[in-house]
């Protein structure tokens, strides 16, 4: 019978997609993967679709919640801890891997109490509350970006696990005989500030320099975004969401998007230059730190939302459209910063502590 591994990740795709990459790697090595999540996260959709058994505990975040939630917090933590401990006792995993989300707090503590090796992985350049609290309990601490955690014998810089198909091997065709292609990404829900900004900015780019545009606007905003482009006199293809991200990245020459950890690492994997507009109200401003990983090396342009209006973005776009060699150089730098071995490294570390 295959040995069990328990993965803890939930809430958003930024936690769940890297965890799914690790799950597939564990499976290729002959391990049975189980998943610990919460009832309200995106894992409820994605994990069963991947054919993985999903175990749920009742836990939610406290940051920014009211007094009533804070009063209930100790009881909720105790309840979720007992739920997680029961699941771990039943599964008897050789290792528990936590990749973020509220589930990792009680799940990680339960692993420690059960004597099961715990490995945590932080996707962002600024560690989340749950992962910070688990550092003393973990056997190994993996980070996507250098120096997210304080230096210690536990720390390993692995990069972010991303889908293998994003590591493009074939070079993009030359820009000598076609217009550059601009991909705008707003995430699964869309980014309304980008939906408003891009049509206005592209209208100010000279027509002869204007790129082809594919804009992912989110389900609720696709129609109004398409209308904005039409009113601005800018030709663009607008979609609510993108199913095949590998194909979209392969099509693009430049990406404008937020700076979520997974997105930043996918851009590096795809060797794509980018304009990054960090979410202004992200916890601990972690998206700015994520963006700096690429921007400080010249692989991206960091555009703070509060300081970026249509005219400023139009000027930036006009400049790079006139310099295709700059786009190519930025993409080459992005590829150099990629970590194609990230998934294997994280799984290697888990099995090292499990069997070491």
UniProtKB/Swiss-Prot annotation:
Transmembrane segments: none annotated. Signal peptide: none annotated. Keywords: Cell cycle, Cell division, Cell inner membrane, Cell membrane, Cell shape, Cell wall biogenesis/degradation, Glycosyltransferase, Membrane, Peptidoglycan synthesis, Transferase. GO terms for cellular component: plasma membrane. The keyword Cell membrane applies. UDP-N-acetyl-alpha-D-glucosamine binds at residues 12-14, 124, 163, 188, 242, 261-266, 287. This is UDP-N-acetylglucosamine--N-acetylmuramyl-(pentapeptide) pyrophosphoryl-undecaprenol N-acetylglucosamine transferase. The gene is murG.
């Amino acid at each position: 019978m295959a040995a069990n591994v328990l993965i803890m990740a939930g809430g958003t795709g930024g936690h769940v997609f890297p965890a799914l990459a690790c799950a597939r790697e564990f499976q290729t090595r002959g391990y049975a993967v189980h998943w610990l999540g919460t009832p309200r996260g995106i894992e409820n959709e994605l994990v069963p679709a991947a054919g993985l058994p999903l175990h749920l505990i009742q836990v939610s975040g406290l940051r920014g919640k009211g007094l009533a939630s804070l009063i209930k917090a100790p009881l909720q933590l105790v309840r979720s801890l007992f739920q997680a401990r029961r699941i771990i006792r039943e599964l008897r995993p050789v290792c528990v891997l936590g990749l973020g989300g509220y589930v990792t707090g009680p799940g990680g503590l339960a692993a420690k109490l059960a004597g099961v090796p715990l490995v945590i992985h932080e996707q962002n350049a600024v560690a989340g509350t749950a992962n910070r609290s688990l550092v003393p309990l973990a056997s190994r601490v993996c980070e996507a970006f250098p120096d997210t955690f304080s230096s210690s014998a536990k720390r390993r810089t692995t990069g972010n696990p991303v889908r293998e198909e994003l590591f493009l091997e074939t070079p993009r065709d030359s820009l000598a005989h076609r217009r550059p292609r601009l991909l705008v990404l707003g995430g699964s829900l869309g980014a309304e500030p980008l939906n408003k900004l891009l049509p206005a900015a592209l209208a100010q780019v000279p027509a002869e320099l204007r790129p082809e545009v594919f804009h992912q606007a989110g389900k609720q905003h696709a129609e109004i975004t398409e209308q904005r482009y039409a009113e601005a006199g800018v030709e663009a293809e607008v979609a609510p969401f993108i199913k095949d991200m590998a194909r979209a990245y392969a099509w693009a020459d430049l990406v404008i998007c937020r700076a979520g950890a997974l997105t930043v690492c996918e851009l590096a994997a795809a060797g794509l230059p980018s304009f990054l507009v960090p979410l202004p109200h992200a916890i601990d401003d972690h998206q700015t730190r994520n963006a700096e990983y690429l921007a400080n090396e010249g692989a991206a342009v960091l555009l703070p939302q509060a300081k970026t209006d249509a005219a400023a973005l139009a000027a930036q776009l006009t400049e790079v459209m006139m310099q295709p060699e700059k786009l190519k150089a930025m993409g080459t730098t992005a590829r150099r910063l990629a970590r194609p071995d990230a998934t294997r490294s994280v799984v290697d570390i888990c099995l090292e502590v499990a069997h070491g």
